[in-house]
Amino acid sequence: MPARAQKTQAHLPKGFTEKRANVDGVNINYKIGGQGPVVVLLHGYTQTSHMWTPLMPRLAASHTVIAPDLRGAGGSARPPDGYDKKTLAKDIRGLVRQLGYEQVKVVGHDIGLMVAYAYAAQYPGEVSKVVLMDAFLPGVGDWKEVWLLRDLWHFHFYGETPLALVKGRERTYFEHFWNDFAADKTKSIPEADRRIYAAAYARANGMRAGFEYFKSFEQDARDFAAFSATKLGMPFLVLTGEKASGTFLIEQVKMVATSVSGTVVKGSGHWLMEEATDQVVPAIVAFLN
């Protein structure tokens, strides 16, 4: 078995399988396991579906769990376009329908929370619950206060020169996120996971695709502003890091949804699943159950 396959299989939770589906011409890699109502887990930037490993077995006890790699990440295809969050949500909804499901609960972290919101906003009749974890919603409220923060320069770091600068240095670039966005870098992304993520984004067009997530924010802002004209009625759980987005995302979600429960996770930075596993996993499981 190739080394890469060994690494992938070694980190696949018991009871889960990894597959690929062609969704409207785009190959989407996903992990699936469990039985019951469907929960879709959407990862963020610098990560893949692997980030959900601590949560997947817990949810699989009562749910069918689908954890895809977003277009452009992990084992999914990396086409030149289609990285606005409306399109990414359509990819995931297409996967769900192809697997024979319609009704879902959606969980998203970082870029994944934007995709989760776009999914719920476009298909509100198909989404019963939403969990959003630590980032922000472009186009909602004072979103530009985050988008234009000097410390978040990476939102504007794309194009040929940035690509040339990070080529072969993917992990060096990602260390900035993993270390600086954590409350304590020693409790951030584990070493084994850092190797997995760096290798995934080092694949052909991986970094280009990642940059496209941010390049699309202005389009996302237009789309989300239009979505927000109609508040969503399904329950939302918003989890944020005390040392990261704090109450900002919670207040944003209250502008777009009518039933919002927000928790600022004490002592955590951006990487909630890794920094505060013992707080976050039970909270998500309880909410979705």
Label every model-predicted segment.
Residues 54-57, 61, 121-122, 282, ...:
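Short, well-ordered alpha-helices that flank and scaffold nucleotide-derived cofactor binding pockets
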Residues 1-3:
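N-terminal export signals
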Residues 6-19, 26-28, 38, 66, ...:
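Flexible "cap/lid" subdomain of the alpha/beta-hydrolase fold that forms the substrate-access gate
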Residues 48-49, 114, 269:
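A short, glycine- and basic residue-enriched loop/turn
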Residues 26, 32-75:
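Conserved HGGG/HGGXW glycine-rich cap/lid loop of the alpha/beta-hydrolase fold
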Residues 268-277, 281:
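Catalytic histidine-centered segment of alpha/beta-hydrolase-like enzymes
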